């Protein structure tokens, strides 16, 4: 298991890389988002990662409306993803995530699924050309369902899954982590950990919501998963990140 941190998009990326490395994390989940982590010197970032011997996973903007029914907006989103792939490729990053798009007025869930799959297909080909693996992150309905992810993986066999355990807890009778690992464990290549109280994506420190982390970790370990886990915890008090890491290590 490797434990990393998602850089806070409100803070300068350079400062985040230094803090993450100096506090002994294994990798940075490098998100490219405004205001603090959008425009930066790629060569400087690459040099820092190398000097700190810090590994990296690629995280993209979760709010891009790439299925919105206007060609100009879709093109802009596609251009953004091309930029992400280029930057991550320069940084030697091999895993890049993508979030489903929900911004489609008057579109049924079925049509949203179809439009997302079509976009994923294009981005996946671009990633493959750059020797990168694309992974889809679970979130809100209809992209909270293991069945929908089974369908996506069936249509795009070499795409992978980025499972956010916090997202799997939102508006569900039971956390869906077990269901995802039961049906798609061989497709899951990256995890996000943060806590919540079951209604919103709160990004709380571990143990501050209602997720049963000991049980979640038991499920994950039983599957044989031993890859990257990102702590996606947003708090001005960064000692909560360190405490969450210590709790994770203890529970693991």
Region annotations inferred by a language model:
Residues 1-85, 89, 160, 249-252:
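N-terminal pre-domain/capping segments
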Residues 1-2, 10-21, 146-163, 169-252:
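Histidine-acidic metal/acid-base catalytic patches
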Residues 2-7, 28-30, 56-61, 96-98, ...:
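Hydrophobic faces of well-ordered beta-strands that scaffold small-molecule active sites
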Residues 7-15, 30-44, 65-72, 104-108, ...:
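Acidic-and-aromatic substrate-binding clefts and catalytic sites of carbohydrate-active enzymes
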Residues 9-13, 48-49, 86-89, 110-117, ...:
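Short acidic/polar alpha-helix capping motifs at helix-coil junctions
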Residues 17-23, 39-58, 83-92, 124-129, ...:
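Acidic (Asp/Glu)-rich catalytic clusters
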Residues 62-66, 102-105, 195-201:
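Conserved radical SAM core fold
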Residues 67-160, 170:
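Active-site acidic/histidine proton-transfer and metal-coordination neighborhood
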């Amino acid at each position: 298991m490797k434990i990393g941190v998602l850089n806070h998009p409100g803070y300068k990326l350079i400062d985040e890389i230094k803090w993450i490395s100096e506090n002994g994390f294994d990798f940075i989940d490098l998100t490219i988002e405004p205001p603090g982590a959008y425009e930066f010197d790629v060569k400087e970032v690459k040099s820092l990662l190398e000097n700190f011997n810090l590994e990296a996973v690629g995280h993209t903007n979760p709010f891009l409306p790439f299925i919105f029914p206007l060609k100009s907006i879709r093109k802009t989103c596609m251009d953004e993803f091309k930029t992400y792939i280029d930057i991550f490729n320069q940084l030697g990053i091999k895993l890049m995530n993508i979030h489903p798009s929900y911004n489609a007025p008057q579109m049924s869930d079925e049509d949203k699924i179809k439009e997302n799959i079509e976009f994923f297909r294009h981005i996946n080909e671009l990633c493959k050309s750059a020797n990168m693996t694309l992974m889809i992150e679970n979130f809100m309905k209809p992209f909270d369902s293991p069945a929908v992810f089974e369908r996506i993986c069936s249509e795009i066999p070499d795409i992978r899954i980025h499972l956010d355990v916090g997202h799997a807890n939102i508006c569900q009778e039971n956390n869906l982590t077990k269901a995802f690992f039961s049906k798609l464990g061989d497709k899951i290549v990256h995890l996000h950990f943060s806590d919540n109280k079951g209604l919103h994506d709160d990004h709380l420190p571990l143990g501050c919501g209602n997720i049963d982390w000991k049980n979640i970790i038991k499920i994950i370990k039983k599957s044989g998963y031993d890859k990257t886990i990102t702590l996606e915890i947003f708090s001005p008090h960064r000692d909560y990140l360190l405490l969450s890491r210590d709790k994770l290590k203890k529970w693991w």
